[in-house]
Curated annotation (Swiss-Prot):
Modification sites for Omega-N-methylarginine: R107
GO terms for cellular component: cytoplasm; nucleus
Provenance organism: Homo sapiens
Gene3D superfamilies for the chain: p27
Annotated keywords: Cell cycle, Disease variant, Methylation, Nucleus, Phosphoprotein, Protein kinase inhibitor, Repeat, Tumor suppressor
Location of the region described as Disordered in the Swiss-Prot/TrEMBL record: 124-153, 181-260, 278-316
Keyword Ribonucleoprotein: no
UniProt GO MF annotations: cyclin-dependent protein serine/threonine kinase inhibitor activity; molecular function inhibitor activity; protein kinase inhibitor activity; protein-containing complex binding
Pfam family, any one: CDI
Modified residues (Phosphoserine): S268
Tissues expressing the protein: Expressed in the heart, brain, lung, skeletal muscle, kidney, pancreas and testis. Expressed in the eye. High levels are seen in the placenta while low levels are seen in the liver.
Consequence of substituting P158A: In BWS; uncertain significance
Other remarks on this protein: Paternally imprinted, therefore most expression comes from the maternal allele.
UniProt name for this protein: Cyclin-dependent kinase inhibitor 1C
Length: 316
């Protein structure tokens, strides 16, 4: 069915009569879209709806909300009147008046009651002020007579203050104590005398000079060690002397002797000249000497190391 056919009044009436449209569509609020609003009809419908709601509430609570009183006769619920103090504070915060629930405010009411009484004494005080000017001439006569007596009583009290007595006593005592103090001033004079005494004390400073005395004792040991090293160098094969700069694994006895000799040769100088004299190598030999220490030399025999490994490390 198209929208044009729905605009005809006859079609709308037939649909409403059949009950095809829902109930809300047949109300005056929906019909107002197609014509003027009938306010009287709307008010009648509103009253009818409110009456239905009131009837439902009365049946549910057995209470007449329009008259604000319970329904007479036995019912599902029974209402009893109780004192307001016995009701919990939650229910005393609001009160139902007709169909509106108002919030109770006990504090503002108490404040209003407390403020109102002071207004009456204020009015009385104003009346007293009005009467006061009439009594003023008689009041000042006894007032001056009563005020002067306390003045002489308070005046003598500060007079016997012990301040002036304590001042002269404390002053001479302080002067007498401080006067003899500056007398021992010449005491600092003998101070420079003891300063000259400790001056010669630093004389024994040159004593540490003889410390290098052990040098002559170490000379025979160094010479003996040099001879032992030269003997070991002479017994090594010629191939090891040619590749003396290549690092390798030293023998057990040789490593021990070289370790002991290195500790003693740290202070010796002649071995440096001997080492520089034997350090002449060619370019290919230097490339072969770049092999790391853990790896054996490709040209050296397995198990045979160089004796000059320790001196070369010491020079570097």
């Amino acid at each position: 069915m198209s929208d044009a056919s729905l605009r005809s009044t006859s079609t709308m009436e037939r649909l409403v009569a059949r009950g095809t449209f829902p109930v809300l569509v047949r109300t005056s609020a929906c019909r107002s879209l197609f014509g003027p609003v009938d306010h009287e009809e709307l008010s009648r419908e509103l009253q009818a709806r409110l009456a239905e709601l009131n009837a439902e509430d009365q049946n549910r609570w057995d209470y007449d909300f329009q008259q604000d009183m319970p329904l007479r006769g036995p019912g599902r619920l029974q209402w009893t009147e109780v004192d307001s103090d016995s009701v919990p504070a939650f229910y005393r915060e609001t009160v139902q008046v007709g169909r509106c629930r108002l919030l109770l405010a006990p504090r503002p009411v108490a404040v209003a009651v407390a403020v109102s009484p002071p207004l009456e004494p204020a009015a009385e005080s104003l009346d007293g002020l009005e009467e006061a000017p009439e009594q003023l001439p008689s009041v000042p006569v006894p007032a001056p007579a009563s005020t002067p007596p306390p003045v002489p009583v308070l005046a003598p009290a500060p007079a016997p203050a012990p301040a002036p007595v304590a001042a002269p006593v404390a002053a001479p005592v302080a002067v007498a104590v401080l006067a003899p103090a500056p007398a021992p001033a010449p005491a600092p004079a003998p101070a420079p005398a003891p300063v000259a005494a400790p001056a010669p004390a630093p004389a024994p400073a040159p004593a540490p000079a003889p410390a290098p005395a052990p040098a002559p004792d170490a000379a025979p040991q160094e010479s003996a060690e040099q001879g032992a090293n030269q003997g070991q160098r002479g017994q090594e094969p010629l191939a090891d002397q040619l590749h003396s700069g290549i690092s390798g694994r030293p023998a057990a006895g040789t490593a021990a002797a070289s370790a002991n000799g290195a500790a003693i040769k740290k202070l010796s100088g002649p071995l440096i000249s001997d080492f520089f004299a034997k350090r002449k190598r060619s370019a290919p030999e230097k490339s072969s000497g770049d092999v790391p220490a853990p790896c054996p030399s490709p040209s050296a025999a397995p198990g045979v190391g160089s004796v000059e490994q320790t001196p070369r490390k010491r020079l570097r």
